[in-house]
A protein has these predicted regions:
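N-terminal pre-Walker A segment at the start of P-loop NTPase domains
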Residues: 18-37
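The Walker A (P-loop) glycine that initiates the GxxxxGKT/S ATP-binding motif of P-loop NTPases
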Residues: 52
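Walker A (P-loop) phosphate-binding loop of P-loop NTPases
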Residues: 55
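Walker A/P-loop
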Residues: 59
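Conserved substrate/cofactor phosphate-moiety recognition/catalytic segment
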Residues: 63-98
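Conserved phosphate-donor/acceptor-positioning beta-strand/loop module used by diverse small-molecule
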Residues: 112-130
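Small-molecule kinase domains that catalyze NTP-dependent phosphoryl transfer to phosphate-bearing small molecules
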Residues: 136-188
Length: 188
């Protein structure tokens, strides 16, 4: 019994050591808050691009909330096609809109009227998502149900957020947390 308890504690510690930490007092969050408050003062809608990775739970979040969360329309990046498939899509919306999608940084990754954040779930949540996906589907999509592949994509995404020991972009551990932070800062 004691040996199994020690093993469980060691596994939890290993998972925590592999995870990342962020502090919403970091200057990147202050800058984000100032941008969102400026948009509100200018009477512009909240337009938010959430960058994430494969297996982060984007589709589940959108479906679970019926494409609406805290007064914001939730848009799936995968539903758009063509050369204009970028955060510039948000400029067509006159009401609060959140575009959830891939973490690649394109030429539109710094539009003045679009706020950008990342969502990178904890390793524990990733493992839970993969287990649920594998449990509920008889024929698995090779990449989206492969924990090794998803963890690799997660690491690549974290490499965009943190570089050289500093945080470059706001990051949250869930879509709920990211949208809530931005909606509250904006004043939705």
């Amino acid at each position: 019994m004691m040996l199994s308890l020690l093993w469980v504690l060691a596994q939890q510690h290993a998972a925590a050591a592999d995870d990342y930490a962020y502090n919403v007092s970091d200057p990147v969050y202050t800058k984000l808050t100032e941008q969102l408050q400026r948009l509100k003062r200018q009477r512009k809608p909240l337009r938010l691009k959430i960058n994430s990775h494969t297996g982060a739970g984007k589709t589940y979040f959108i479906r679970h909330h019926n494409s609406k969360y805290l007064g914001c329309r939730l848009l799936d990046f995968d539903d758009f096609e063509g050369a204009n498939r970028s955060s510039a899509l948000l400029l067509a919306y006159d009401a609060c809109a959140v575009l959830l999608g891939s973490a690649h940084l394109d030429k539109h990754s710094s539009l003045e009227d679009v706020a950008y954040v990342f969502v990178v779930p904890s390793l524990k949540d990733i493992r839970h998502n993969v287990a649920k996906r594998n449990e509920g589907v008889s024929k698995h999509h090779e990449r989206w149900s492969n924990e090794t592949y998803i963890v690799k994509k997660r690491e690549e995404t974290l490499g965009k957020v943190f570089r050289g020991g500093r945080q470059r972009f706001p990051v949250f551990s869930s879509f709920e947390e990211g949208v809530r932070f931005c909606a509250e800062a904006y004043g939705v």
